[in-house]
Amino acid sequence: PQKGFILNGRSYPLRGVSRHQDRKGAGIALTNEMMEEDIAIILEMGANTIRLAHYQHAQYFYDLCDEKGLVIWAEIPYITMHMKNGRANTLTQMEELIVQNYNHPCIAVWGLSNEITAASAVNEDLLENHRLLNELAHKLDPTRKTTMANVFMLETTSPILEIPDVNSYNLYFG
């Protein structure tokens, strides 16, 4: 961790953005041209990594990321609130995300959840669901790390931080 991100044996500082797949007038049904425009803007900014928030993105966008050599964080739509009855859905979402995308060299990490403690207490059911997601991700793809985006108020001693390989915090300025 003290050396940062290493790519092909060399330090590779990550500078990136979080991307949602939507546009005014198109919603989530982006054309290939729109996705190419997004990539061009992201590269123009000097970014080399993208977090594909918070759901499965178009295969064409993953292909563009492969082509451009971008480092990708792909994640499932497990956001803000843990639902006891949602375990099967989160596990299915993770399996589908990995099965559909594990051949994309751009992917560096699989995201387990986003700010899941924003509206949910850290309890054993939430922890168990994250353990199962983490185990599933490693079973389906033992070559990549797992991560989760934590809300900035989460205590650094929270037991949920022990589950993924990499922890991240969303910070909101202004």
Predicted regions and their residues:
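Active-site-adjacent substrate/metal-binding segments within catalytic domains
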Residues: 1-131, 146-147, 167
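Extracellular glycoside hydrolase catalytic/binding regions
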Residues: 128-174
